[in-house]
Amino acid sequence: MSLRDRLQTALKEAMKAKAAARLSTLRLINAAIKDREIANRGEPGAADVTDADIMALMSKMVKQRHESARAYAEGGRLELAEKETDEILVIEEFLPRQLTGDEVEAAVVDAIAASGAASIRDMGKVMAVLKGKYTGQMDFGAVGPAVKARLG
């Protein structure tokens, strides 16, 4: 079952269960997917939105909500921070499990070995191996410094 189908099924279940917060979050995800489809229509040779595109979109949504929740908590708006946290939980249901720090470190070591990287100049090769194998399972912005440290 594709990710889009899973989202549609969850949306229908949320409607039947009258789960307003969950329904709202699922509708936000669908709206973001539709926005991406519309943006892709204008590009020549652009394909439909794939599961990988949807995962990247949802990962971005999770990051945005983490930032918002932190800002709300710092501002004393705990009810809004809690709402953002609830949305994160709903979105993460559809994302692959995130790797732990130790697993990320092991993946970096394996990717360096697989790509034959010897210096910092080979960082792109290592990141390409990681992105091919672990899309949606790790934050590549945070992995970059770990790869740099290993190669440098």
Residue positions per predicted region:
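Charged, compositionally biased, marginally structured helical/coil segments
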Residues: M1-G152
